[in-house]
Amino acid sequence: MNKVIILQGLPGSGKSTWAKQYCKENPDAFILNRDSLRKMLNNGEWSAKTEEFVKAIELSALEIILKGTDNATVLIDDTNLNLKTVNNLLKVCNSLEADVALKDFFHVPLHECIERDSKREKPVGSSAIIRMNEELIKFKSYISKL
């Protein structure tokens, strides 16, 4: 049975590092990442204009992988702090009967995420990470009520 691991956390929390290590240990695993798709479509720049395309391509790629394999593991290596985004991923997974696991990186302190991000070639920026942290607080509050 196929398995999808949805990574969740702020930029700089270690999601991509974890995903790369997972793939070293599990060479048949796939990583889907919207940042990588943005690089192909828009030179890595985020824009509202292309973001819907990026999300649609990621969902389509997930569907293609799940339909084309029997025992794949797919890592969704994005922040995944938006409930609508997570629900869209879950719909694809459920429709194709894939096992789903959430792997969160919520334990990484905000200041550490900001520091790690500042060392990147293309940093997201502290104001964006702080804004995403506010989304994360809302997300965790919603999840705790389930």
Walk through the language-model features, giving the residues of each:
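Conserved beta-strand scaffold positions in the cores of enzyme catalytic domains, especially
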Residues: A29-I31, V100-K103
